[in-house]
């Protein structure tokens, strides 16, 4: 039989007979590896263990203890779930099945009624029965005609057949007699599946379009070991407690009502106060660092986005243009860059003015599908803390360092400590997809690297991750829920200044092309607020808290006037304070203030009235201490002004 060469991750190459499977290769290495193996990768693509190999390739063995191993488990559990549902509710229709960051999901459409969360235990028990039976998850590729016949009567599966067709074939699984269309990679059988849990039911539009039917999406998770499932359930419990949507509702920060517009949050007074505090902080900080704040329209002529390239590259993320009837087409802006370019172009610029730093809390709109929307994290209307600096080429490195130092300063004030830097370069093996200027790329990438080294900052380098118009620095962070996201970005742009024909007059009296630096310190107000809600678990530091102090009179008729006097003194110092005059028991008022996570609870009674003092209780503490009212006010003012990051 013909031999083929198999390359392993360490670079070694071994010959095998043509037609060898991933499992065969694992067995040839060691019995223990074969027992741990659940899938493989061929030239980076995930494949089943029984995948035959007929040519020279590079492979990896995917084991149970890897991220890809979890994905294979989740794909398998999703298939088992379809079989379990079918056995309990014959005739049910199936939409998408897939995996997410922490588990799997299956979309269903039960014709006579919806599947509710109360029905999950019975479905889960059936899944466990199927898993214990150690059935095979039989995979095959069949013709489109066979696939359509297998899913006859299920309109969603029929559409998936047509969508997944490749060269006249469709990938399907037979799970205990139930045929399901899926390209996902699954286990050979259920024998390695040890722990499964169904978690919730939610609505999901078919294909993510609000004009399509609403299906029931069943979420679950599964693992190879029970202890891993228990750890995940504990993580999810913590995630729920930190979920900004849950906290946002409990603390009355914001709400989203699909009836008046999905992805369009309403900021309630508490949430608006937090946002306003962030915005004031950002503006003051940027002004101190030489930025000129502007206001620019949320509507712009479509031609500007054609010039910038947004229309060509990001049209699917933009709302449809508005035809004004006179040939003018207006567009809700998805980016602020063209607006700030117009500010720059409004005057003739001299080299003496550079760098010119323009900033704005700019409202933008993105065409997000309903299924992608989530609280404040994914919205259709957002306000970006955006900044654009126009520099001469020899100013790039110095300005890049200044922006980076500003970012680090902001992170410190918000107590953000868990972040990493990623320098993104163009792919040297595929330069065609980038702005065509080799000298520019080489020089600018070297400048950014030198700036990071000068500042003594650790970073990773990522080839192929640059924007098409220039290299960039991404600041990556882990949210309180363990998800990685980009907190801030600095991007060099050599293309837009050319597209919009930007100039400055140099010392030689000639026109020169500036370089544009895009930067966002803290992303959008919506996403950053969500990040902070989850990071602080709703217990904001005093300077950000919507209500910083609540004053509770022991007896309102005797101590209410003193409480009001204290309130007036604090309001004069810009402290956010309220007096609880309600006819409720003091213990109830204290518990409610703690539930609202107000940093300071002040109780005033006879002793406090007589001594002009307050009884102070910090959030999260059971004990109180007596303090002169003037001292308390002075201390909290200092705390607020210094962006104190602890409520103590």
From Swiss-Prot:
Primary location group: cytoplasm
Gene Ontology BP annotations: threonyl-tRNA aminoacylation
Family matches, as Pfam families: HGTP_anticodon, TGS, tRNA-synt_2b
Binding site for Zn(2+): 337, 388, 518
Database matches in PROSITE patterns: AA_TRNA_LIGASE_II, TGS
Alphabetized InterPro entries for the sequence: aa-tRNA-synt_IIb (IPR002314), aa-tRNA-synth_II (IPR006195), aa-tRNA-synth_II/BPL/LPL (IPR045864), Anticodon-bd (IPR004154), Anticodon-bd_dom_sf (IPR036621), Beta-grasp_dom_sf (IPR012675), TGS (IPR004095), TGS-like (IPR012676)
Superkingdom per UniProt: Bacteria
Coiled-coil regions, chain positions: none
Gene Ontology cellular-component terms listed: cytoplasm
Enzyme class: ligase
Gene Ontology MF annotations: ATP binding; catalytic activity, acting on a protein; metal ion binding; threonine-tRNA ligase activity; transferase activity; tRNA binding
Keywords for the protein's UniProt record, in alphabetical order: Aminoacyl-tRNA synthetase, ATP-binding, Cytoplasm, Ligase, Metal-binding, Nucleotide-binding, Protein biosynthesis, RNA-binding, tRNA-binding, Zinc
Manner of cofactor binding, per the entry note: Binds 1 zinc ion per subunit.
UniProt entry tagged with the keyword Signal: no
Region (Catalytic): 243-541
Compartment list: Cytoplasm
Protein family (similarity comment): Belongs to the class-II aminoacyl-tRNA synthetase family.
Quaternary context: Homodimer.
Protein name from the UniProt record: Threonine--tRNA ligase
Organism: Pediococcus pentosaceus (strain ATCC 25745 / CCUG 21536 / LMG 10740 / 183-1w)
Gene, per the UniProt record: thrS
